[in-house]
Amino acid sequence: SQVVQQAQSQRVLDNTSHTSRRIKAVFERLKPYANQANQTGTPFNWQMNVFRGDELNAWAMPGGKMAMYTGMVERLKLTDDEIAAVIGHEMTHALLEHGKKAIGGQVLTGLGGSILAGASGVDANIVGLGTDLLASKPFSRHQESEADAGGVRLMAQAGYNPEAAISVWEKMSKLEGSSSIAILSTHPANQTRINAIRRMLPELMPIYQKNKR
Protein backbone atom coordinates (compact mmCIF):
# COMPACT_ATOMS: atom_id res chain seq x y z
CA SER A 1 0.00 0.00 0.00
CA GLN A 2 1.02 3.57 -0.54
CA VAL A 3 1.16 4.32 3.18
CA VAL A 4 3.56 1.44 3.77
CA GLN A 5 5.83 2.46 0.88
CA GLN A 6 5.79 6.04 2.12
CA ALA A 7 6.67 4.93 5.62
CA GLN A 8 9.56 2.83 4.36
CA SER A 9 10.98 5.60 2.20
CA GLN A 10 10.64 8.16 4.98
CA ARG A 11 11.69 6.08 7.96
CA VAL A 12 14.51 8.17 9.34
CA LEU A 13 15.02 8.05 13.10
CA ASP A 14 15.03 11.49 14.68
CA ASN A 15 16.70 11.71 18.08
CA THR A 16 17.72 15.35 18.04
CA SER A 17 14.98 17.72 16.85
CA HIS A 18 12.94 19.87 19.22
CA THR A 19 9.83 17.88 18.20
CA SER A 20 11.53 14.57 18.98
CA ARG A 21 12.65 15.82 22.38
CA ARG A 22 9.09 16.96 23.17
CA ILE A 23 7.60 13.60 22.18
CA LYS A 24 10.14 11.70 24.29
CA ALA A 25 9.65 13.95 27.32
CA VAL A 26 5.88 13.37 27.25
CA PHE A 27 6.45 9.63 26.75
CA GLU A 28 8.77 9.49 29.80
CA ARG A 29 6.15 11.19 31.98
CA LEU A 30 3.43 8.75 30.92
CA LYS A 31 5.58 5.63 31.24
CA PRO A 32 5.34 5.03 35.04
CA TYR A 33 1.53 5.26 34.86
CA ALA A 34 1.43 2.88 31.90
CA ASN A 35 3.49 0.45 34.00
CA GLN A 36 0.99 0.77 36.86
CA ALA A 37 -1.87 0.08 34.43
CA ASN A 38 -0.20 -3.04 33.04
CA GLN A 39 -2.34 -6.08 33.85
CA THR A 40 -0.85 -8.42 31.25
CA GLY A 41 1.33 -10.24 33.76
CA THR A 42 4.45 -9.31 31.77
CA PRO A 43 6.45 -6.12 32.39
CA PHE A 44 6.69 -3.96 29.26
CA ASN A 45 9.99 -2.58 28.02
CA TRP A 46 8.67 0.80 26.82
CA GLN A 47 10.67 2.46 24.08
CA MET A 48 9.76 5.44 21.88
CA ASN A 49 11.18 5.77 18.37
CA VAL A 50 10.56 9.09 16.64
CA PHE A 51 10.63 9.10 12.84
CA ARG A 52 11.17 12.24 10.78
CA GLY A 53 8.40 12.46 8.18
CA ASP A 54 5.12 14.13 7.29
CA GLU A 55 3.03 11.04 7.88
CA LEU A 56 0.29 11.38 10.46
CA ASN A 57 0.85 8.19 12.37
CA ALA A 58 1.84 6.73 15.71
CA TRP A 59 1.68 3.18 16.99
CA ALA A 60 2.57 0.83 19.81
CA MET A 61 3.35 -2.86 19.97
CA PRO A 62 2.46 -5.26 22.76
CA GLY A 63 5.63 -5.27 24.84
CA GLY A 64 6.07 -1.51 24.72
CA LYS A 65 7.90 -0.57 21.51
CA MET A 66 6.33 2.63 20.21
CA ALA A 67 6.80 4.98 17.28
CA MET A 68 5.53 8.38 16.26
CA TYR A 69 6.16 10.56 13.22
CA THR A 70 7.22 14.17 13.71
CA GLY A 71 4.52 15.07 11.17
CA MET A 72 1.87 14.16 13.73
CA VAL A 73 3.08 16.97 15.99
CA GLU A 74 4.15 19.51 13.38
CA ARG A 75 1.24 19.25 10.94
CA LEU A 76 -1.43 19.14 13.64
CA LYS A 77 0.47 21.71 15.76
CA LEU A 78 0.01 19.50 18.82
CA THR A 79 0.53 20.83 22.33
CA ASP A 80 2.29 18.62 24.89
CA ASP A 81 -1.13 17.71 26.32
CA GLU A 82 -2.30 16.65 22.85
CA ILE A 83 0.89 14.61 22.31
CA ALA A 84 0.05 12.89 25.62
CA ALA A 85 -3.44 12.10 24.29
CA VAL A 86 -1.98 10.31 21.25
CA ILE A 87 0.69 8.43 23.21
CA GLY A 88 -1.73 7.47 26.01
CA HIS A 89 -4.23 6.12 23.46
CA GLU A 90 -1.56 3.98 21.79
CA MET A 91 -0.12 2.77 25.11
CA THR A 92 -3.59 1.58 26.09
CA HIS A 93 -4.06 -0.39 22.85
CA ALA A 94 -0.76 -2.14 23.62
CA LEU A 95 -1.56 -2.70 27.32
CA LEU A 96 -4.94 -4.22 26.47
CA GLU A 97 -3.24 -6.40 23.84
CA HIS A 98 -5.74 -5.41 21.19
CA GLY A 99 -5.26 -7.57 18.17
CA LYS A 100 -2.69 -9.82 19.85
CA LYS A 101 -4.26 -12.84 18.19
CA ALA A 102 -3.72 -11.49 14.68
CA ILE A 103 -1.67 -13.44 12.17
CA GLY A 104 1.54 -14.83 13.62
CA GLY A 105 0.96 -13.02 16.89
CA GLN A 106 3.16 -10.13 15.71
CA VAL A 107 1.07 -7.02 15.98
CA LEU A 108 1.48 -3.32 15.50
CA THR A 109 -1.33 -1.15 16.73
CA GLY A 110 -1.50 2.16 14.98
CA LEU A 111 -3.25 5.42 15.53
CA GLY A 112 -4.87 4.55 12.24
CA GLY A 113 -6.89 2.19 14.34
CA SER A 114 -5.18 -0.44 12.23
CA ILE A 115 -3.82 -3.70 13.42
CA LEU A 116 -0.78 -4.37 11.28
CA ALA A 117 0.31 -7.95 11.56
CA GLY A 118 3.53 -9.34 10.13
CA ALA A 119 3.99 -13.07 9.65
CA SER A 120 7.69 -13.37 10.33
CA GLY A 121 8.03 -10.86 13.11
CA VAL A 122 8.73 -7.19 13.28
CA ASP A 123 12.20 -5.68 13.49
CA ALA A 124 12.09 -4.51 17.08
CA ASN A 125 14.94 -2.03 16.65
CA ILE A 126 13.34 -0.11 13.82
CA VAL A 127 9.72 -0.24 14.83
CA GLY A 128 8.81 0.37 11.24
CA LEU A 129 6.09 -1.02 9.08
CA GLY A 130 7.67 -4.34 8.14
CA THR A 131 7.92 -5.47 4.53
CA ASP A 132 6.20 -8.64 5.65
CA LEU A 133 3.00 -6.79 6.36
CA LEU A 134 0.11 -9.17 5.94
CA ALA A 135 -3.00 -7.75 7.47
CA SER A 136 -4.38 -4.38 8.29
CA LYS A 137 -7.80 -4.12 9.80
CA PRO A 138 -9.48 -1.51 11.94
CA PHE A 139 -9.83 -1.89 15.66
CA SER A 140 -13.39 -2.50 16.75
CA ARG A 141 -15.33 0.46 18.04
CA HIS A 142 -15.22 -1.16 21.48
CA GLN A 143 -11.41 -1.38 21.39
CA GLU A 144 -11.18 2.25 20.30
CA SER A 145 -13.43 3.29 23.20
CA GLU A 146 -11.26 1.31 25.62
CA ALA A 147 -8.10 2.96 24.25
CA ASP A 148 -9.68 6.41 24.57
CA ALA A 149 -10.78 5.73 28.16
CA GLY A 150 -7.44 4.28 29.26
CA GLY A 151 -5.49 6.96 27.42
CA VAL A 152 -7.23 9.92 29.04
CA ARG A 153 -6.76 8.31 32.46
CA LEU A 154 -2.99 7.96 31.87
CA MET A 155 -2.90 11.61 30.77
CA ALA A 156 -4.65 12.86 33.90
CA GLN A 157 -2.42 10.77 36.18
CA ALA A 158 0.70 12.20 34.50
CA GLY A 159 -0.62 15.74 34.86
CA TYR A 160 -1.73 16.36 31.27
CA ASN A 161 -5.12 17.93 30.62
CA PRO A 162 -7.50 15.18 29.43
CA GLU A 163 -9.53 17.80 27.52
CA ALA A 164 -6.68 17.73 25.00
CA ALA A 165 -7.89 14.31 23.83
CA ILE A 166 -10.96 16.09 22.47
CA SER A 167 -8.96 18.75 20.67
CA VAL A 168 -6.73 16.11 19.01
CA TRP A 169 -9.75 14.38 17.47
CA GLU A 170 -11.24 17.72 16.47
CA LYS A 171 -8.00 18.64 14.69
CA MET A 172 -8.02 15.28 12.94
CA SER A 173 -11.62 15.53 11.85
CA LYS A 174 -10.91 18.93 10.28
CA LEU A 175 -8.38 17.17 8.08
CA GLU A 176 -10.76 14.35 7.21
CA GLY A 177 -11.15 13.99 3.49
CA SER A 178 -7.51 14.85 2.91
CA SER A 179 -5.95 11.82 1.23
CA SER A 180 -2.80 12.04 3.33
CA ILE A 181 -4.71 11.24 6.50
CA ALA A 182 -4.59 7.48 6.17
CA ILE A 183 -5.31 7.09 9.85
CA LEU A 184 -8.82 8.47 9.54
CA SER A 185 -9.99 5.78 7.15
CA THR A 186 -9.98 3.29 10.01
CA HIS A 187 -10.14 5.73 12.87
CA PRO A 188 -13.02 8.14 12.33
CA ALA A 189 -12.77 11.17 14.59
CA ASN A 190 -16.46 11.20 15.16
CA GLN A 191 -18.70 13.07 17.53
CA THR A 192 -19.71 9.91 19.43
CA ARG A 193 -16.11 9.42 20.41
CA ILE A 194 -15.65 13.04 21.47
CA ASN A 195 -18.86 12.91 23.54
CA ALA A 196 -17.69 9.74 25.30
CA ILE A 197 -14.41 11.44 26.29
CA ARG A 198 -16.35 14.50 27.46
CA ARG A 199 -18.44 12.31 29.79
CA MET A 200 -15.26 11.07 31.49
CA LEU A 201 -13.96 14.57 32.28
CA PRO A 202 -15.81 15.15 35.60
CA GLU A 203 -14.01 12.13 37.05
CA LEU A 204 -10.63 12.88 35.43
CA MET A 205 -10.24 16.64 35.85
CA PRO A 206 -9.64 16.42 39.64
CA ILE A 207 -6.92 13.78 39.01
CA TYR A 208 -5.32 16.13 36.45
CA GLN A 209 -5.57 19.16 38.78
CA LYS A 210 -3.84 17.19 41.54
CA ASN A 211 -0.98 16.03 39.30
CA LYS A 212 -0.59 19.10 37.11
CA ARG A 213 3.00 20.39 36.90
Where are these regions (language model features)?
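A Zn2+-metalloprotease active-site environment signal
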Residues: 1-213
